[in-house]
Structure formats: C-alpha cells, structure tokens
C-alpha cells in the first residue's frame, strides 16, 4: 500500500483490516489538535486535502475507564502493540495529489522527487525526544526524521508510562486549541504566568495607605479602628488641649468614585494591580487622611486641620524667605519731618469732627442700648469680654495696611490708613487729579491672645500729602522694622517701616516711617496735637523714562504689590490704562535712578507691559515663587503672569468684575471678590480660582448679595475675610486647596459672620432710638442721599458675633441672620450706603495673627480678635519666636554696680 509521505498520516474509515480493527487510540485527542493545527496552516491550493480522525464504529467506543489504564497494563499493552504509525499508514488510503506537491501539507519548490518508502519507525524510546520542550525549536524536514504525528504519539506513549499525578499549576507544554480559536503557543502562556507573578509581587510590595503624620497607622482603609488620641493635624503637630474622647479618630476618607474591585479568586487570569497615576485636574490618587471629631473651639477637626497646617507652612516660609534688615540707605532723617501748625494742617484734615451715632450689640451679652459718638482721631476702650475696639478717622476709608513686625518682637502694632477728606466726595478714575489728603498712622498697642488690650487705639501722627486720593498703600513685607530703642546718631531715627502709596496723580511715593517715640521726642513740649507732618519722601516712582515722562498716558495708579520674598527689591503697580509697571528699588542704573536736588530719588521702571484693556484694579504676587503674579482688571479678566515671559499670560479667566483678590501662601490659586453688576444669578460672592496648573474648577466659598469691596487672607489661619456693601463682615476657612475642592461637603460650616452693620432710623431724638427695629434687624429703608441727611435721622447698629467659641454655630442667631441675608437681598441703592465696608485686613504678624481691622463709608474703624481660631499651637510658636528674638536682638545692658556690698576684711582683736 502506498504511503502518504513524510509527516503526513491519512486515516481512512474505520473498519476491519485482516484480523485487526482500528479504533480510537489513546493519542486521538492529540491527533485532533494536530488536525486543527495542520488544517489552519494549509494554503488555498491545499484546501482539497482533508485530514480527519477515524470515527469509531457503533459499539466500539472506548469508555474513559478503558482509555485510562493502570500503569502496569499500559506498559504491557504498549509492548504488545505494534507501531501505530506504521499500522495507520497501512490502513490509510492515499488521496489524489497535485503534481509537483508533496503530500503532507508542505509546499516544496523544484522538481518532484521520487517517493521513498518510510523508514521503519524506531521503538518508543524516551531518550529520543527533548524532555523539556519538544516544540520549542522547529525541526527541519529531512529524510529519516519522524513526522509530527509520530513525535506526538511518542510523547503520548511516554506520558502513559508516568503514574497519574495531580494537574500541575503551570500550563501544559504543548499547544492548547480552544474551540473556535487559533492554537495558543507556550510563549503566550509563559507571558501570562509572568504577569500573574508580577501582579502578586506588586500587590505585596505596594505601600500602606497614607495616614496623618505622627498619627496611628490605619491597618485597613475600609474598616478603621478607633484609637483614642489627641487631635492631630496634617502638618504633624499635636494640639494641646484637644479633646481626648472616643469620637475622635483617624479614618481614611472614602473616595466619591468607587474604585474597581480586585479580581476574584476564581478568576483564571487576574490582572496585575498597578498603582494608578494621578493626572492634572483630577482628585488625588492617594487616600487622604481625614480627621473626625470636634476641636475645642466647636468646629469639626477636618475644618481646623488646614488651619494648623498653615501655621507650620507660614512659619517655615518666613524663616526662609523673610529678612531682618533691608534698604539700609533709607533711614528716616529728623530734618525731613516738618511739624505743621494748626493753621497749616487744617486743609489736610478730614472735615467731619464727630462720628455718626452708633451702637454695639454683642451676642450673648445683655443689650444696654448705649449710643456712642466719638470725636475725630478718638477711640473707645476695648470691651473687657469681647476685646473689640472702635475709633473714628474722620472720613470714608479707602486704603489700609498693617505694619509688619518680626516674629517674636512683642512690640506695639500699627496700621496705616487713608480717609477721604469729604464724606460726599466722588473720585473719577478717568483723569488725574491732585489735592490735599492725610495719611494716618494708628497705634493699637500690644495685641495678644491671652489678655484684652490695655491701651486704647490712638492716633500717632499724620503725613500731609498733596497727591490727591490714595487708592492703595503697602508696607515692605520684612526687613524694614527695627527696635524702637536702637541707638542712632542724630539726625537718624529708628525706622518703623517702608510704606508705598498709590496716588491719584499717577505717582507712587515711598516713605520711610520712624518710630513714634523717637519722632515725638523731637517736637517741642507745646506742639499741637494731633501731630501732622509734612515729609519729604525717600523716592518718587514714575512711569516712562528720563526723556519721555508723561503720567497722563497711564492715568491713576490704582493698586500696588510688593515683592514678598527677600530682598523685596521689586515693586509692582497697576494703572488705569491697563499697564503693569515694575521698579527695581535698589538699582544703580543711571537710566532708572536720578538724584534730585532735595536729596530724594526719582526711579523709572525696568519693565512694563499692557496687562488689561482697562484699569488694573488689584495685583498680588505669588508668595511661594516671585516669578508669578496675578492681576485683575475692569475688563472682567483675571490673568496669571510669568514675569520671565510677560508677552502672554499663562492663564486668563473672564468671569466677572473683580474688586480685590488674595493669594494665600499654601495654595496654587486666588480667592476673588466680585462686583455683583456682572455676576450670574446665584453665583455672586467669593470664589476660589485655581491658577491653571491643577485644573480644578472654581470653588464657591461664600455667596454674597451685594458688591464685595474688600477681601483679605491670613496665611497663618488659611482664612479669608470679606466686607461688602451691605455692611456685613464674614470670614471663611478655606479647605485644603491642594486637593480638589469639588468633594468639599457643606461649605456653610466653614464660614461665619464677624459683625453686621445696619442703618437704623430713630423717631424723635438721638436719645430715643427705635430699639425694636434695631433688635429685629430689619431696618426701614431710608431715602437720604447725603451724609448730613443720613446721620440726622439714623444711627448705625453693629451686631457682633461671639468669636470666642463656635459651638452650635449653625443654630445661633448671627449665623441664621447671615444665611437669611444670603437668600434674598435687602439692599437699597437709592440712599447713601453708610454701613458699607470698604477695607478689611488680617494682621500678617505672628504676635497678632488672629486680629482683624475693618472700616468703611462711615469712617469708623473696628478691630476684632477671632479668638476661636487661635490655637495652643500658635501660642507655642509665639513663645518660641520671642525666645529666639530676645536671644538675637536683646540690647546689651551697660555694666551696673553690684546690688550687694563688697566683702570687708578686718583684723579681729586677739583674746
């Protein structure tokens, strides 16, 4: 019988051949796989060649028990069984093949070779086959070699010799052919096995979930264990006096978006667990710590945690980026300070000599109904329980700033401010104007956290200016203050600070302010009080250059920003025409610095660019990196700038008309106050806007129904304060803006009112006001349009919140009143807004970081201490800073005589 060629086995229909009937052999399953493999590799020309396994006749099927014999019987049957390949070749019938092709499924080029009979098959010896991987390398088809069918049968017979064992965990070495799919090679199985092992290694090597520093480790993020411990902040500091109860424990906050669960144990192909990367603009991939429980002040710990974190960050920043001494050439000179007489100072003084009537209602204290009216440059004593202070400046307040003091100095606090001379005066922005004005410096005493201020706020001295309205003023952030008792040779005076003024005549004036004690010691005993001085500024900053100077091109200077990091050599100013100008203060360039005949300096900018299409209303530097600056203009745009590439902003946002903004130290964004004329319905108020790096959406900090005139942020507290046209001053604790604020729940718990001012009409006389309308908080809308008409028939009612504690805050009356005002507006724009708040400033100093000063249209300036946000952590920082400051700057005392008598020696008489 003809053979079918090397590597090809054709099996015909099963039937009796001689005395032997061909039935399914133990290698039929392997032959089925070979059949599928061979059929998949056949070309179109070989489609006619078919190969199939014999189908057993009815009654001759083998049962599973018959196919699986014991090892002894299998070995005996194998010895008695002839070569299966030769027997199958004998019973197979050759099929017609095309000329020039070799039967066996492989195409061979060239002339047809004469067919040779198959060599006798070798006995089934295990050593002839590679035990490790028989199919790892393809065998060349040569004469004398066995076919694939023979090799597979040899492999099968060898496996039959082995005793039955448990199925190995690793995949089989041969091919696997799932139904309807191509054969799966061993390389794919090895790769899958490698991925499974890699997944197991990664799952064991992944770090544990991140928890609060110095806190207990959370073993399972899904089932945290309650641990009794003091309150801990993310910054890693324990807070003394924190409640040690079972309600406070650290728990990993569950993500809003559920993570996909890991593969089940029944899954045959688990996917590797790889840590997920966090793209920009998405929530943090790592699990953030979350503080449960309540803080001692009544606020939840998760609200107070950013406050404690900001204390650490601000302290570290000031130690690295602030300086103790800068601008050594600008020391106050006594002969430049000319004391004005009463007649000379009269044009510069505000016109109003008495304040409007006002009353103060304090939450939790009985109402006394006392009406106050104080004189110009006078104040009232601080309240013994609430520590609030009030004084009258004489006119509407439009500029305000604290004098920076080094950490730990323990010195008196000062604020500089500007009030308009006339209560009814308007200030056009489109043209330059000049006129008399008074810059005021007020002393507030040593403001502490432990005790009420012992001294009243007092008017220290004033500076007469002829440059019109002062729209903004800024102190040098550090390096300009020295001890009041610093010995200086006359005429030098100890310096209090460097102050820059943005004036309506387009100029920027720079003053070197002396300490009041040293300056007042120079005046005669019969000097006029209050002390008003005419001062020569140390430098005048103008736009343009030496050959082209026209201040009218840029218009009024509306905003200032001092470089926040040492050496503070750059000062930025925003103008009416949209120009932002930068001066290099210590420059020696003859093109930027000119010495005038009176000894003062005139400086020209080294850089300027057009930032907005209209007036630049506010500027702020990035405290973390001085290369970045943000500006807001009347074109409703907020722009972030990289000063190394000022030709294009790195981000521009057009939202609404911004009035003021604050860029807090820890965060990559700004908090913006807005005018409600362009605000969308329901979105008027205070927003936090990301600079664009993280891609977070705007966070709605607090809704407001009126225009928010001023906004201030405290780096120490991570808190912002805002005053609006309705006379309400509120504060809001920002969440951790390093994380996406979209997941912040119940922002109403983060804000609280400080006080609310209402204009209340009285019926008959100032001594008999309508206290019923005052207590109800719903004033009748008056129609007075001038200051005189308003104060003749109305008084101001200040309703203060108890800031010592925030327990049960959401159900307290000031909080309910604030929420009611956020729902509907009570503004009456047909009258003078005497209760409006124009300026708000948090203290930047560590010694008084919880104090807040505010003032507005009435000319009354009020000082409050947010005692509830002060913590033992801040108090400990104050003590450490005072010890460090005293060790560095304590003046050496002169040698004193000893307080005891020297030892005397005398001879004793002899007995």
UniProtKB/Swiss-Prot annotation:
Residues 35-46 have a biased composition (Polar residues). GO terms for biological process: 5S class rRNA transcription by RNA polymerase III; transcription by RNA polymerase III; tRNA transcription by RNA polymerase III. GO terms for cellular component: nucleoplasm; transcription factor TFIIIC complex. The modification Phosphoserine is found at residues 63, 132, 165, 167, 220, 260, 597, 871, 892-893, 901. SMART domains: WD40. PANTHER family: GENERAL TRANSCRIPTION FACTOR 3C POLYPEPTIDE 2 (PTHR15052:SF2), RNA POLYMERASE III TRANSCRIPTION INITIATION FACTOR COMPLEX SUBUNIT (PTHR15052). This is General transcription factor 3C polypeptide 2. It comes from Homo sapiens (Human).
